[in-house]
């Protein structure tokens, strides 16, 4: 399990990609992280390969996503950490070439962008919310994977 600390929290305030109010067209493998982001994609006809959500926004405001996912997985991931269970499930899901899968988080999904970038293949599009700004769209690259490895080394491991 990795625990968030002040140093990494400061780094994570900066988006990993470009921030959009409306996303451009997206091709290839797509992972969405966050309820509002996933809802926006689905309402625009974009079905991610994997959606990671907890049915809340801003920690406690319920979000209704009227979509029936093809396959659903659940894991626990407490606030401020990346649980071993979440890491193992994301690692497994990164090997599946399917669409319309959901990973439902009991706890908080905010930090799970980190293992998604670590385990999903290069050129995967990852979209997550940047609170009060929009959605961040990034393509996984080797350079980004190296940055994530450094962040993980800077986190407290238990």
UniProtKB/Swiss-Prot annotation:
GO biological process: coenzyme A biosynthetic process
InterPro entries per the UniProt record, alphabetical: GTP-dep_dephospho-CoA_kin
Pathway(s) annotated for this protein in UniProt: Cofactor biosynthesis; coenzyme A biosynthesis
Keyword set, alphabetical order: Coenzyme A biosynthesis, GTP-binding, Kinase, Nucleotide-binding, Transferase
Entry EC no(s): 2.7.1.237
Signal peptide (from-to): none
HAMAP family given in the database record: Dephospho_CoA_kinase_GTP_dep (MF_00590)
Family according to the record: Belongs to the GTP-dependent DPCK family.
Protein's recorded name: GTP-dependent dephospho-CoA kinase
Source species: Methanococcus maripaludis (strain C5 / ATCC BAA-1333)
